[in-house]
Amino acid sequence: SSGIGLEISKALARRGYNLILTARSESKLISLASEISEKYGVKVDTITSDLSDQTAPNNIFNFCELNKYDISVLVNNAGFANPDKFHRTSMEDEERFIRVLGISVIALTKLFLNKMLYKRHGKIMIVSSVAAYAPPSVIQSLYGPIKTFMNRFSESLNTSYNYKGITSTAVCPGYTVTNFHTASGVQDEMD
């Protein structure tokens, strides 16, 4: 509902794609959907969802099925970071982190991939990070490693399904000033 995800949404809308947006904040989603729909003349639907909830991927998929949405592009772009150094966070914090940035991406991809295989067409984008290639960080001990995993996962998907008309791309932006850095405490550590 902000940052890189917002810009990807606008770029797809400019190209005429109808959108289904998910985020935790219902009010932000409704406002964003209205803004994009009016500006670009596309249909925008929303589903409020927290990807740290293990039922979220199935709920999102079921919402799309119920509404008979034909998903041709899946963008996995949830932002999440723990607000402290590794030794200060709880195991529950780390599990939430892995669920949002790892397990939910795998689950959503698995669910929508089967529909794409049936159509023999689809595009999967995983928003990763240049942190996958950077030296390990004191600030976020798991962030770079999970982004490395996401890059390899995307490569594996592309190799495994490209011949069936499905492509997968990992996008690795560098440091980008967004709400993510403020909310996660990363900006404070960098200042």
How would you label these PLM feature ranges?
Residues S1-L19:
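Canonical Rossmann dinucleotide-binding motif of NAD(H)/NADP(H)-dependent dehydrogenases/reductases
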Residues R15-L32:
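Conserved glycine-rich Rossmann-like NAD(P)H-binding loop of the short-chain dehydrogenase/reductase
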Residues N77-N82:
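Conserved NAD(P)H cofactor-binding loop of Rossmann-fold oxidoreductase domains
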Residues K85-H87, D93-I98:
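Substrate-binding pocket helix/loop in short-chain dehydrogenase/reductase
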Residues T109, I146:
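Active-site helix of classical SDR
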Residues S129:
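Residue(s) in the substrate-gating loop at a strand-loop-helix junction
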Residues T159-D191:
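SDR active-site lid
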